From Swiss-Prot:
Residues that bind GTP: D14, H15, G16, K17, S18, T19, N131, K132, I133, D134
Organism encoding this protein: Francisella tularensis subsp. novicida (strain U112)
Gene: lepA
Gene Ontology molecular-function annotations: GTP binding; GTPase activity; guanosine tetraphosphate binding; ribosome binding; translation elongation factor activity
Keyword Transferase: no
The protein's name: Elongation factor 4
HAMAP family documented for this protein: LepA
Gene Ontology BP annotations: positive regulation of translation
Substrates-to-products reaction catalysed: GTP + H2O = GDP + phosphate + H(+)
Domain tr-type G: 2-184
Amino acid sequence: MKNIRNFSIIAHIDHGKSTLSDRFIQVCNGLSEREMKEQVLDSMDIERERGITIKAQSVTLDYTARDGQTYQLNFIDTPGHVDFSYEVSRSLAACEGALLVVDAAQGVEAQTVANCYTAIEQNLEVIPILNKIDLPSAEPDRVAQEIEEIIGIDATGATTCSAKTGIGVEDVLETIVAKVPAPEGDVNAKLQALIIDSWFDNYLGVVSLVRVKNGTIKKGEKFKVMSTGVAYQVDRLGVFTPKMKDLDHLKAGEVGFIVAGIKDIHGAPVGDTLTHAHNPTDKPVPGFKKVQPQVYAGMFTISSDDYPDFREALEKLSLNDASLFFEPEVSQALGFGFRCGFLGMLHMEIIQERLEREYNLDLITSAPTVVYKAIKKDGEIIEVDNPSKLPEPGAIAEIQEPIVRANILVPKDYVGSVITICIEKRGVQVDLNYVGNQVSITYDLPMIEVVSDFFDTLKSVTKGYGSLDYELIRYEPANMVRLDVLINGDKVDALASIVHKDQAKYKGRELVERLKELIPRQMFEVAIQAAIGGTIVARSTVKALRKNVLAKCYGGDVSRKKKLLEKQKEGKKRMKNIGSVEIPQEAFLSVLKK
């Protein structure tokens, strides 16, 4: 046990943690040269394309240190994006140490700071590493100072390396061996194993990645899941080197996988504790918190025949993703679908992209919304995650919206423009500190403003240097209203949204104008309106197409022409009463995408 080291890497997107993990695998000969490829641990195509890590992965490597001893390094890769911080907190619960990898050219980013505090809260040994020192623009001394000022850990003797060229990677491994504490735990105690992650394999069923805290688990033994109390038998267990390598047992301090033929997707919930069926422990492993979805959106298949496949795809994805929530929903405009809950916009985009890619589904997503609380006049509180659930304006005493505390780190040249966008988004300034070249700005902002497009706007006004981290802190009363879209007097439920009253007119006008361009002309006039309750705030009309009914009259009497025009007018009127407007899918997509 004293030669085991469990650690994870905390780093911002693009600061080189996946490349560094590739180097670890190479130095320790985890894979042959032929099997090495870039970003070995980012196994999904979408992770490679976007260059981000979404799922936490784990690798067990044997490293022979300079003192001649062989150490077992269990390394858990973690994502760096703000939406996936729950993956990070889970990975950290399984470790004793964390490498804080910072790009020596760019410096500290807000996301890294947030994850670093999570690690410090869980009493992990945080070791600063300065990466990308091969870059001409690298300034290791300045960045070391920044780490000290912003995060507050001593970085004077920080190990420097370049994961790309391989310089200093062995020094990093030596630092891990020297500074990360060995795991505590008793091999002979009752079994306690934390499920860090679980995913569905078509052949094996549910595969769970576990960290054994106490005791030993052997092949063929029966164990039970503490939250459900259901018992299973171990079919296979072992470690990832990154390939699956079978072993006979896993003991306290180790990280590995367990396959027990669990078919039910929720059979082994992530963050749960496993223990022996015949001799169970009383208490589960602490340090795990349930994640609440922050953003909700309706997802619908374009053809209704795909609905059963869609349900199955969501069930499979939700196994790999503890934070994805979904329930069936019916929309008059879009048919059958699901109301899904996500951690943030990136999470939503990725889920949608995975559904479309891995399961060949064509999907439409309704406008994302956050959870509001509507307090009715009779005192009842309704949680509203869908505009259609909002009661009529007359029945509501007040609506409360979720407020997040956003920590933004930007280079000092961009402070003015960042403050401007925060004010536009109805933000309230809490704090502003200058730290070296960076400025740390803290704002309380309505969550709906942050999840819609705040991140993109922040990136564009700061030329990509700004970074953001946010957490929900409270609910507060706000003047929110439901904006409905009516087409020829009929409400289109998929286009309804909850907006702030001050912005309602502007948003309504914008929506109506956009729809006007997208809805094709019909044989009759189409009225597009935006309404709040019974008040119409914006209107636009798609003019009717008309056939030239006078083409066959050569000369002749004017009353003949009048008669034909009157007849056409009557026909259009009748058509308008009974005709229904086909809204093309592109119109929905374009309006919902903004």
